[in-house]
């Protein structure tokens, strides 16, 4: 492990574990190795000894204190035996909402090119500016090795209602910002979500690839003060995401789904591009229908 790696892990510890909270480190490869830590020295020791096995992750939200009683307390047992890891019900509370910006590479299990990452960085900046304009407190931005992570500080109880809120919030961001180059991952809404540990490398692809290299995950920017954004700001963005229409007097209690493709064809609307986003499709029209 290099000095730069150690510095990145120490920086992550200061930012994410400043209250001395419990964290789980998980290494996902042929097997899944796991450890629960309150001591950064033990954590670095085990990451250094095991990082060659796969990608290294941390829980973005603190596990309940009881998880510290598991057999992985301050250690990472080896041998590939099955062990308990942090599940949604094991999370004490939500401290961060993750926006995960993935480069669209066209094929699976490869690292991104420099050009693909350039698109992702521009998108990351667009989202960051948008959220700041909407009143959000600044988040922490990480280079995830193959894309970018924005960690938005929050203070949310770990409830089903808040899980639905976070899911709709992320989907609303994806609806607005995902395109053919960059995808905002809508699957990262769960409370026990893990993210790439700064100071560790991507485990994807070939180590010999020059145009798709294995890169280190790094912290890029941290606000002067990490301050939680109030719940109502997340709600306001989440409410932009459309809900599926239910049968009502307004639609004659119809149970049929509106066929947008058929509507476009019947009315001769010119579509220049269709882009898959979140749970739907974005249509880029040749011209505004109201001009």
Can you name each region flagged by the protein language model?
Residues 95-134, 145-176, 193-209, 215, ...:
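Modules that initiate DNA replication and primer synthesis
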Residues 1-146, 153-172, 260, 269:
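Signature for HUH/AEP ssDNA processing cores
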Residues 88, 139, 186, 276-277:
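Residues embedded in well-ordered secondary-structure elements
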Residues 140-146, 182-189:
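Short, glycine/acidic-rich hinge or "gate" loops at secondary-structure transitions
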Residues 175-183:
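Histidine/cysteine- and/or acidic
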Residues 27, 215-216:
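Positively charged, low-complexity intrinsically disordered regions
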């Amino acid at each position: 492990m290099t000095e730069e790696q150690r510095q990145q892990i120490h920086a992550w510890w200061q930012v994410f574990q400043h209250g001395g909270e419990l964290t789980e480190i998980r290494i996902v490869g042929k097997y899944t190795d796991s450890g629960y830590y309150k001591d950064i020295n033990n954590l670095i020791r085990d990451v250094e000894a095991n990082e060659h096995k796969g990608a290294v992750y941390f829980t973005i939200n603190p596990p309940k204190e009881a998880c510290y009683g598991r057999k992985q307390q301050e250690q990472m047992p080896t041998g590939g035996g099955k062990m308990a890891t942090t599940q949604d019900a094991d999370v004490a509370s939500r401290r961060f909402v993750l926006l995960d910006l993935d480069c669209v590479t066209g094929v699976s299990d490869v690292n991104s090119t420099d050009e693909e990452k350039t698109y992702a960085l521009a998108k990351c900046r667009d989202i960051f500016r948008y959220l700041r304009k909407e009143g959000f407190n600044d988040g922490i931005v990480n280079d995830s090795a193959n894309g970018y992570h924005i960690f938005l500080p929050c203070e949310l109880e770990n409830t089903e209602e808040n899980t639905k809120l976070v899911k709709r919030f992320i989907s609303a961001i994806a609806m607005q910002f995902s395109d053919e180059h960059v995808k905002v991952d809508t699957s990262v809404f769960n409370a026990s979500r893990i993210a790439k540990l700064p100071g560790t490398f991507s485990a994807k692809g070939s180590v010999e690839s020059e145009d798709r290299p294995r890169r280190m995950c790094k912290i890029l920017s941290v606000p002067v003060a990490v301050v939680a954004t109030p719940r109502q700001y997340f709600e306001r963005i989440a409410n932009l995401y459309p809900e599926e229409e239910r049968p009502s007097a307004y639609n004659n209690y119809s149970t049929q789904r509106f066929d947008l493709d058929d509507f476009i064809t019947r009315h001769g609307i010119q579509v220049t591009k269709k882009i898959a986003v979140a749970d739907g499709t974005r249509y880029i029209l040749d011209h505004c229908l109201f001009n």
